[in-house]
């Protein structure tokens, strides 16, 4: 399906010209500093990593569905738009969860996931608004008990116990302990976006309630679009 994209990312004549411009500008500290920010090698590295991540995802998909299923992607305008939007966002973030979500959005578009084009466009741009923590919380609340099972841990919800949503959150993400105010802020934001059906982390509930899925139908669609699907 593709040659090794790493070879295509070797420096071009344009890259060499830019290097020359930066060399000339080095005698003017302010200009040199500005160019370092805009055209720095970390940004090039970020671009290369994103393109390789996307190419590897498409190659994995090709092996799953076959060459013929993907041969029309180059003419698929919806796919092109999603990839362009995702690429623009990927260049502005270093957060791995966001870049993975963007890549999955592209791959799921190529797989013709059953979500309307308008929703796909909204969902990709929504990734740009959300934080790494937001995405983690959404993935957890899609199905808390399943998330624990994936970690090899079984939660017994038949016993007696009470608590709030943070009981499960902090058990699954212990690194979030002590961040009650920020976690509450992010959940409230996800609720305002229509992705979660619960606004407060302070409501006391049973064990069943603590580990219930908490996404709205829109939230479920969003997660299905941005996660890796078999």
Name each region found by the language model.
Residues 100-230:
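Long, helix-rich, hydrophobic modules that act as membrane-proximal anchors or helical bundle/coiled-coil regulators
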Residues 41, 61-64, 68-71, 89, ...:
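Surface-exposed polar/charged interaction patches
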Residues 17, 21-24, 31, 35, ...:
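Short runs of predominantly hydrophobic/aromatic residues within well-ordered alpha helices
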Residues 9, 16, 20, 39, ...:
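Non-transmembrane, amphipathic alpha-helical segments
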Residues 2-58:
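Membrane-inserting effector segments that mediate pore formation, membrane fusion
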Residues 80-111:
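N-terminal leader segment of winged-helix/HTH proteins
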Residues 24, 57, 64, 105, ...:
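Residues that form generic nucleotide/phosphate-binding pockets
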Residues 42-85:
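Amphipathic, membrane-active segments
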């Amino acid at each position: 399906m593709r040659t090794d994209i790493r070879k295509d990312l070797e420096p071009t004549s344009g890259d060499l010209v830019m290097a020359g411009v930066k060399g000339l500008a080095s005698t003017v500290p302010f200009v040199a500093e500005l160019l370092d920010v805009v055209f720095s090698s970390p940004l090039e590295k970020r671009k290369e990593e994103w393109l390789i991540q996307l190419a590897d995802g498409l190659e994995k998909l090709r092996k799953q569905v076959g060459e013929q299923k993907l041969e029309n992607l180059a003419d698929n305008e919806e796919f092109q738009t999603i990839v362009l939007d995702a690429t623009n966002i990927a260049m502005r973030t270093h957060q791995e969860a966001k870049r993975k979500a963007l890549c999955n959005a592209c791959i799921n578009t190529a797989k013709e996931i059953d979500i309307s084009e308008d929703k796909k466009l909204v969902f990709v741009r929504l990734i740009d608004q959300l934080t790494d923590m937001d995405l983690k919380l959404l993935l957890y609340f899609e199905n808390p008990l399943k998330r624990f099972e994936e970690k090899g841990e079984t939660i017994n919800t038949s016993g007696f116990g009470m608590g709030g949503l943070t009981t499960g959150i902090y058990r699954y993400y212990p690194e979030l302990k002590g961040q009650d105010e920020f976690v509450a802020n992010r959940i409230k934001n996800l609720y305002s976006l229509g992705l979660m059906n619960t606004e407060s982390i302070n409501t006391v509930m049973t064990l069943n309630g603590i580990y219930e899925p908490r996404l709205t139908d829109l939230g479920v669609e969003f997660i299905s679009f941005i996660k890796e699907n078999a």
